[in-house]
Amino acid sequence: MYVNGRILRILKFKKDGFRQQNFLYPLLLQEYIYSLAHDHNFNSFFFYKPVEIFGYDNKSSLVLVKRLITRMYQQNSLISSVNYSNQKGFWGHKNFFFSNFYSQMVSEGFGVILEIPFSSQLVSSLEEKKIPKSQNLRSIHSIFPFLEDKFLHLNYVSDLLIPHPIHLEILVQILQCWIKDVPSLHLLRLLFHEYHYFNSLITSKKSIYAFSRIKKRFLWFLYNSYVYECEYLFHFLRKQSSYLRSTSSGVFLERTHFYVKIEHLIVVCCNSFHRILCFLKDPFMHYVRYQGKAILASKGTLILMKKWKFHLVNFWQSYLHFWSQPYRIHIKQLYNYSFSFLGYFSSVLENHLVVRNQMLENSFLINIMTKKLDTIAPVISLIGSLSKAQFCTVLGHPISKPIWTDLSDSDILDRFCRICRNLCRYHSGSSKKKVLYRIKYILRFSCARTLARKHKSTVRTFMRRLGSGLLEEFFMEEEVLSLIFLQKIPFPLHGSHRDRIWYLDIIHINDLVDHS
């Protein structure tokens, strides 16, 4: 979780009674909370024009926040505005627009407040375990060296999908374990109702586009807390079923409500719970997750993996009330199966090498088997993403980008080169470089078609007039930081470079749709 330095300084100097009793609701009336939310997340059109809309010099004054919370609780005005908006259209009624703006503004500030107890406990746990922040590898590519080191000795792999909550009240119950402030929980339920109501009401493409541009810090926090609840069950079973202490499970905070459920489970099942844990013992169990997809690999047998699947699904559904679909959890043998994870198709390849050894007059053959984790960039999904972003057709034929023809030539070149560089950089760990060459070819000629369309010319005439040096940035070599040797080595995207390179500065996967 991202730790805000200014929030921690606020906690250090704020010694109010509500903070000591975990009362978060009064923080909603503090102006600096909304300035923090504005600095971090609000980069949309809502906060570029709030002064003209509301007529306030301060965008989030104390009086405004009080009025926002008061009007959110007035259900009659909301219902009347909805009925009127159905007649006049969505943008025809200001009260309806403002009511959504109220909930959006308060929810983002509420998201900043909810992170305060989590951030303080996370920092204290890091200080107790003496874990330097510089040693926390945030790069996504740092996962692949871990897979190369561990997965070569495993037998089975199971790809999981994080189950879906069957009701929004489950999210409130998750946060109820951490927050003892009743008004904050009531406000949380109200925000859930607002989001559910607006999502079901807004159906036009313009409205969806407008509200989808908002970066919802509040919703990201809820999703992370929900995923943490799902993962905590796995780590609890893993810790209880192993004699050894887990060394790669990361940092997890203390929970109380979960142990109450486990105690109730032990009372119901009597001694069968410990018998179940005995059947789940496996010292070579590895778990990796990114967003909503996870990989569970083991050196055990197929029966052991099926037991883990059975107990995880039943615990999720029976005791945590999470809806899970068992048929979507696939268990495959690692040597005969390629799993999709983090934009790669990964599999373990076996290479056999026959060596002839001769001792005196006797000679014999030695069969040496080596294993290697093979990662391949999925060409079909990449072309599908480029097709959705209108860079090519479904078959991979480059097309022009009409919405970029109003930009300058330098901006068009910069956008195409940046997308090409990001894609080739992220998929630099692919063992088959032909996929990168094809992606680069699509973006290069899509850029040429876009420039030719802007200047009302053909691609051949345009390229002949300006020369081949126009698109030379697509072929420029890039200096990369080697993961093994801390030195810079040239990485030619167009050359015969066969080695896989993992970067240490890629912290998220960029969606191509965001560039359009």
Swiss-Prot record:
InterPro entries: Domain_X (IPR024937), Maturase_MatK (IPR002866), Maturase_MatK_N (IPR024942). Coiled coil: none annotated. GO terms for biological process: mRNA processing; RNA splicing; tRNA processing. It is found in: Plastid, Chloroplast. Disulfide bonds: none annotated. Its main location: plastid. Belongs to the intron maturase 2 family. MatK subfamily. This is Maturase K. It comes from Cypripedium calceolus. The gene is matK.
